[in-house]
């Protein structure tokens, strides 16, 4: 089985990364990247300090502590919205053959498995 690893920092399929520019709208706010939205919202409350940082593709600012009861579902929602509102990116994702496994090898936390799972589920359902 062939793998498609996603990691912005090494430019491995960076267009699918949570740090890639895919501007989207969620709950009254516009976000530059999925990471922008996630860091702003992961605590369960809107974090204005994080939202108004100088976000750009590849940039990451750490927001408040994540609510571990909701953070994975939040990431699922944000990734889905970002692709649905950026159809070119969605088409690129769905063009990846189903036999190709999406990976996120450099990550050492929950996103090593959760991030590829979310993308693979979105790819399969779109």
Predicted segments, located by residue:
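Charged, low-complexity intrinsically disordered segments
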Residues: 1-126
């Amino acid at each position: 089985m062939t793998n498609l690893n996603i990691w912005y920092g090494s430019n491995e399929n960076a267009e699918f990364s949570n740090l890639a520019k895919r501007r989207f709208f969620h709950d009254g706010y516009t976000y530059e990247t999925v990471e922008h939205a996630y860091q702003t919202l992961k605590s369960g409350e809107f974090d204005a300090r994080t939202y108004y940082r100088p976000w750009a593709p590849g940039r990451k600012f750490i927001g408040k502590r994540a609510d571990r009861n909701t953070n994975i579902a939040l990431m699922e929602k944000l990734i889905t919205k970002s692709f649905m509102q950026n159809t070119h990116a969605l088409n690129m994702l769905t063009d990846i053959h189903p036999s190709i496994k999406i990976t996120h090898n450099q990550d050492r936390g929950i996103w090593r498995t959760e991030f590829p799972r979310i993308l693979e589920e979105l790819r399969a359902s779109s």
